[in-house]
Amino acid sequence: FDHEKFTADKIMRQIEKYHITSFCAPPTIYRFMIQEDFSKYDLSSLEYCTTAGEAMNPSVAETFQKLTGVQIYEGFGQTETTMTLGTFPWIKPKPGSMGKPNPQYDVHILRPDMTECEDGEKGEICIRIGDHKPIGLFKYYYRDEKQTKSVWHDGFYHTGDMAWRDEEGYFWFEGRIDDVIKSSGYRIGPFEVENALMTHPAVVECAITGVPDPIRGMVVKATVVLKDEYKSMAGPDLIKKLQDHVKHETAPYKYPRIIEFVDELPKTISGKIRRVEIREKD
């Protein structure tokens, strides 16, 4: 992901020029693509689209499908694993869902006490090890026995990622355990708040983080990139509208008490939002 050279226009023209049929990109790319005027491009060659790197906001996937007629297939995996969850060919995609477990893995969502979460309950994505580690899982962290033991224990590999499972067995991402915000006794997953903000017409992309607060412990902060036509409106009135929008879209206590407008979000080379960098600046 080249922050200096990337433009959605350039990628879309490449898809048109080379008649690309299969396309994989991080959610960041799709977020910027849907801001373009699709009438300027012929993307009819696209047959199969996937995303990787981080969770995709459902509103982005739905908008892309409306514009192209192509569904985006999502999944979940780590450097330490192969594809753990996915919308495989035999699974109907649900926008925003990571899909269902890869048959080679015994995937569970667990509470901190290692008991199984109920459907709809948030917990940690874990892979049961059994007598032998499944093919595809890493063996250990190089020269880091302490870190290895921290993720391999109680008969499971612990991913450190939070999710919940719906009644049909689809998994939905909530965020890294380290990213969960504890505010006034509530546990708030950043991805749910980001999803709510992304449905507002003013927002291109956003990142939710926690900011220390002497009374609540932490408060929710939103770092927001606005669409060009809304940048002149950045101020208290728009902040209030965005806060009210989140209250309407999700539980009111999850709304961002702090909103900062920026020109761009810090990202990794693969296009993932670097929330840790935002937290460090706060």
Task: Write out the residue ranges for each language-model feature.
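Gly/Ser/Thr-rich phosphate-binding loop
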Residues: 12, 20-25, 34-94, 106
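Active-site glycine-centered loops adjacent to acidic/histidine catalytic or metal-binding residues
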Residues: 53, 77, 99, 161, ...
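Short Gly/Pro-enriched turn/cap motifs at secondary-structure boundaries
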Residues: 96-101, 116, 151-155
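AMP-binding/adenylate-forming catalytic core of the ANL superfamily
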Residues: 23, 113, 147, 162-253, ...
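Glycine-centered tight turns that cap/initiate beta-strands
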Residues: 45, 69, 104, 202-205, ...
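ATP-dependent adenylate-forming carboxylate-activation enzymes
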Residues: 1-18, 29, 188-193
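Conserved ATP/PPi-binding loop(s) of AMP-dependent carboxylate-activating enzymes
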Residues: 104, 115-150, 188
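Short beta-strand-to-turn element immediately C-terminal to the catalytic PLP-Schiff-base lysine
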Residues: 85-89, 110-111, 127-128
